[in-house]
Amino acid sequence: MIKALIFDFDGLILDTETHEYEVLQEIFEEHGSVLPLSVWGKVIGTAAGFRPFEYLEEQIGKKLNHEELTQLRRERFAKRMESEKARPGVEAYLNAAKDLGLKIGLASSSDYKWVSGHLKQIGLFDDFEVIQTADDVEEVKPNPELYLLAAKNLGVSPAECLAFEDSVNGSIAAKRAGMKCVIVPNKVTGTLMFEDYDHRLESMAEMELALLLDHLNSQN
């Protein structure tokens, strides 16, 4: 029986990932190159040491000013995020979870400052009883440590948790932790190949939480 929901953050609650990829793609195109999604997709949802501007240098065969490009990336990303809201259905799921008496947690490979800042900006920070980030663990996703820690601090077993993820690395982490996992891919991650999950939604607005839980609980 599912007693807790644990949400990813980037790309799942707030679609930072699509904007991040599109900003990088703009910069790559301005330098006569492209950033293939097949390359970028491998690092979504984790903290892999991929350095996009080093990759760009390799593609075009010349040195670039990383500091200037990083600043440009930040400015363009911030501009895009000014009016960004939670993905469709997120707030409804959080409210429904509270009505159903479920515990609510968050597990993100990003750092706490990033996650908490964005959650406060969209007014959802107080909805989470537990927020686990990269600051709390030795290894982020696809390692299951973030999910296991979130479950522990919510006072439930991993088997009693339902994880919501948008990335391949995130879904791997949730399943390795022994949780059920619903994937809700975004514009970017929707093109990636997911292997192990329990249900797929294109949006949380697609199905009411109570119906989703009934469906998943019936699989036991």
From Swiss-Prot:
The keyword Aminoacyl-tRNA synthetase does not apply. CDD domains: HAD_BPGM-like. Its cofactor is a divalent metal cation. Keywords: Hydrolase, Metal-binding. The keyword Cytoplasm does not apply. InterPro entries: HAD-like_sf (IPR036412), HAD-SF_hydro_IA (IPR006439), HAD_2 (IPR041492), HAD_sf (IPR023214), PGP-like_dom2 (IPR023198). It is an enzyme of class 3 (hydrolase). Belongs to the HAD-like hydrolase superfamily. CbbY/CbbZ/Gph/YieH family. This is Putative phosphatase YhcW. It comes from Bacillus subtilis (strain 168). The lineage of its organism: Bacteria, Bacillati, Bacillota, Bacilli, Bacillales.
